[in-house]
From Swiss-Prot:
Biological source species: Pongo abelii (Sumatran orangutan)
Name of the protein in its database record: Pyridine nucleotide-disulfide oxidoreductase domain-containing protein 1
Record family assignment: Belongs to the class-I pyridine nucleotide-disulfide oxidoreductase family. PYROXD1 subfamily.
Subcellular location: Nucleus; Cytoplasm; Cytoplasm, Myofibril, Sarcomere
PANTHER family the UniProt entry points to: PYRIDINE NUCLEOTIDE-DISULFIDE OXIDOREDUCTASE DOMAIN-CONTAINING (PTHR43429), PYRIDINE NUCLEOTIDE-DISULFIDE OXIDOREDUCTASE DOMAIN-CONTAINING PROTEIN 1 (PTHR43429:SF2)
Length: 500
């Protein structure tokens, strides 16, 4: 017979997921309820902690992500108990989760922060590698040391960073869009960055700031064996720092870009030989395309009919929310992207079950200048806000929507440039009646502003522009800027003086 649902006073606050959203949520709950035990359930032996947090402006924030052993988290917050195990099942009617180690944990409030997993272009192929967490990034480094040529499929943030960071290895980069970085940039910004790709890298590597913890060397008996298919937490900013991304050859950059195409078929060497297919050699400047005489472990046929051989393929084609362990027997409402739908208090469609980070899909009436993107900044903000909402609901208090959801704001680095994205930076969903204003100094900065009805709706800032705070304010207050015209981007005018 099914156990009766326990009263909501029974059980603990339980958070599932050791990534940025889960750890931030657990830390906030631990601070808010110092005398209560907070359970953090994670399949990984290391957790992701936010360090060196800096609030740059009202909404823009910068931080490092540090991998730490879970014991460090328990030392900082004595009321957090980390359970190193995957989740086998969620029994929402009984208010409990069953972990892979067979234990049941009753919750009064549960927050699911299990992240997302990479969409692999081909499952089960040993030559196809998805980069999502630290383990897969280290496996990639191991493979790269032996590689003469690799193929990168995808156009998101990880693909962009990889293409720039890899040295001493030919890279064929296949994207389905017309220009690189389609998620973040328009064609103009892409062109600005592409010139950096073509140039030889001169910047010396700066030693990485983060302490790296590996899972090797820990006593095996001290932790239960996790299933090998458990998904680790997403990589944080600067994830490639400290990884030696060098192939076998002695050159900096050799990149060939194939645009407007996708993967049609992947062949292993034997199959390729039997079919008597022909592949292209690495394209050289202005030379006619030649047949490759070298044999490769794996071959990729693209939808543009070109075939290239390589040592291995990196699949960087995005992620899907990691909802699978929680769906059986529960009637969650899911978003179009497969995420758990959450309302404006990070609450799912099930009682006392919240979600934050990559696993969730926002289903509230969004601010006109905010959109959900599965980025570290939003994982931190959602985890923090979910904890506040759980605390408020437990105490019977009401809580206002967090201000960070008023404006999309993200700061990162691509190709060694500082990149700030604000609001509808790519005119997402604005229709055709918007206009763009641009300022570009090759090799130094790229500034794009999205205007609609005289109001600033978004901006892309590449380089050290010092415009982020002013533009953030202009987007937030929706002031009519029609009278300023081109002066908005005139480098000889200190725009801050206008709006003091």
């Amino acid at each position: 017979m099914e156990a009766a649902r326990p009263p909501t006073t029974a059980g603990k606050f339980v958070v599932v997921g050791g990534g940025i959203a889960g750890v931030t949520c657990a830390e906030q709950l631990a601070t808010h309820f110092p005398s209560e035990d907070i359970l953090l359930v994670t399949a990984s032996p290391v957790i992701k902690a936010v360090t060196n947090f800096k609030q740059i402006s009202k909404i823009l924030e910068e931080f490092d992500v540090e991998e730490q052993s879970s014991t460090m988290l328990e030392k900082r917050f004595p009321n957090i108990k980390v359970i190193e195990s995957g989740v086998k099942q969620l029994k929402s009617e009984e208010h409990c989760i069953v972990t892979e180690d067979g234990n049941q944990h009753v919750y009064k409030k549960l927050c699911l922060c299990a992240g997302a997993k990479p969409k692999l272009i081909c499952e089960g192929n040993p030559y196809v590698l998805g980069i999502r967490d630290t383990d897969s990034a280290q496996e990639f480094q191991k493979q790269l040391i032996k590689a003469k040529r690799i193929m990168i499929i995808g156009n998101g943030g990880i693909a962009l960073e990889l293409v720039y960071e890899i040295e001493g290895c030919e890279v064929i980069w296949a994207i389905k869009d017309k220009a690189i970085g389609n998620t973040f940039f328009d064609a103009g910004a892409a062109e600005f960055l592409t010139s950096k790709l073509i140039a030889e890298k001169s910047e010396a590597k700066i030693a990485h700031k983060r302490t790296r913890y590996t899972t090797e060397g820990r006593k095996k008996e001290a932790r239960s064996k996790c299933k090998s298919d458990n998904v680790g937490s997403a990589l944080g900013p600067d994830w490639h720092e400290g990884l030696n991304l060098k192939g076998t050859k002695e050159f900096s950059h050799k990149i060939h870009l194939e645009t407007m195409c996708e993967v049609k078929k992947i062949y292993l060497q034997d199959e390729f030989r039997i079919l008597k297919k022909k592949s292209f050699s690495f394209p050289r400047d202005h030379k006619s395309v030649t047949t490759d005489t070298e044999m490769w472990p794996v071959y990729v046929e693209l939808t543009n009919e070109k075939i290239y051989g390589c040592d291995f393929i990196v699949s960087a084609t995005g992620v899907t929310p990691n909802v699978e362990p929680f769906l059986h027997g529960n009637s969650f409402e899911l978003g179009e992207d497969g995420g758990l739908k959450v309302d404006d208090h990070m609450h799912t469609s099930l009682p006392d079950v919240y979600a934050a980070g990559d696993i969730c899909t926002t289903a509230w009436q969004l601010s006109p200048v905010w959109q959900q993107m599965r980025l570290w900044t939003q994982a931190r903000q959602m985890g923090w806000y979910a904890a506040k909402c759980m605390a408020a609901a437990s105490s019977g208090d009401s809580i206002d929507m967090d201000f960070s959801f008023e404006l999309f704001a993200h700061v990162t680095k691509f190709f060694n440039y500082k990149v700030v994205l604000l609001g509808k930076y790519n005119a997402q969903g604005l229709g055709s009646d918007h206009e763009l204003m641009l300022r570009c100094t090759k090799g130094q900065e790229y500034v794009k502003v999205v205007m609609q009805n005289g109001r600033m709706m978004g901006a892309v800032l590449i380089g050290e522009t010092d415009l982020e705070e002013t533009f953030e304010n202009l987007i937030l207050n929706q002031m009519n800027l029609s009278s300023y015209g081109e002066d908005l981007l005139d480098p000889n005018i200190d725009i801050e003086d206008y709006f003091d």
